[in-house]
Amino acid sequence: YFDPFSLDVWDPFQA
């Protein structure tokens, strides 16, 4: 997934 509030890819396991 991609987090529009971040410049990184959002990790869903990071919670």
Curated annotation (Swiss-Prot):
Signal sequence, start to end: none
Location of the protein in the cell: Cytoplasm
Entry keyword set: Cytoplasm, Stress response
GO cellular component: a single term: cytoplasm
Subcellular location, principal: cytoplasm
Top-level taxonomic group: Eukaryota
Upregulation: By water stress.
Keyword Cytoplasm appears in the UniProt entry: yes
Subunit structure: Forms oligomeric structures.
Assigned protein family: Belongs to the small heat shock protein (HSP20) family.
Note: On the 2D-gel the determined pI of this protein (spot N144) is: 6.1, its MW is: 17 kDa.
Protein name: Probable class I heat shock protein
